[in-house]
Amino acid sequence: RAPEAHLLHPDLEEVPKPVSVAGGTAGSTAHLAWLDGGGAPFDDVAIVISELGVADEVNRPLWVHLELPPDAPDLDLLAGRVTDSDGQVLSTFEVAAAPQAGQYGAFYHLTFPLRAGSYSIDIVGAAASEPQVKRSLTAEVSTVPDQGTWLSPVWLGTGVTPTPEARHGTAFTIGGWHLAPVSGPELTRTAEIVYFGFVVRPALAEEGTVELLSRVHVKRDGMSLGRPFEVPLDTAHISGDLHMYGNSIGLSGIPEIGPYDFVFEVIDTNSGASAERSVSIEITE
């Protein structure tokens, strides 16, 4: 194989980096320079959530949720880079931003299909060629366990949008349903919380069916409010040994406004495998 120097176009001075995100292009020098400049107006108020998602029975891409307050302009560009644990830049990206309505303001999702390992990710969002927000985060990427029944994290949202054309593994998208994640504690009594997730290699019943059960515990001041809400969950087959579920709970039945803790538990009844997510919510009128 020829050395890298012999593969370069005469006008290039270095080997181009791979693209970090699907649908994007390599980050331009000008846009990547924003990452090393001064602060941006919404750095201190942006909400950033990063979690490992699920693409198939093996791979867990990094999902990033970036949400800005209502007074922020809609972003038109997201750019950034991915570096490894040694500080070497592995890939860069820039992609047109697609704002969507979130719990507090517009949100943006990015999907990073990374191999198992440790990474740092730097992201900048811009509007009209002006940086509006910058954020750096670290991630430890792993794969799905290769044996036994495994349940993904339970993802909580304020709503979902059908996106049947979405690729498997797209950020916060479960079986063609795109979540607007719960990004803060305030919700009204007219709101609902949706909860979605995946199960890999479920233990099938005699009829060959997947049997999942959800329990939603509601607590106030550390005390449970009655018995948990317990319902069987419908599932849908995605591919191979990968299945998904989704459900929701309305908040109109909560007795009064104030702070509550919700615990969402999902159980594969045939194997006993389970996953759980807790969230603190301040319910308002």
Enumerate the language-model features and the residues they cover.
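Intrinsically disordered, low-complexity terminal regions enriched in Ser/Thr/Pro/Gly
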Residues: 2-285
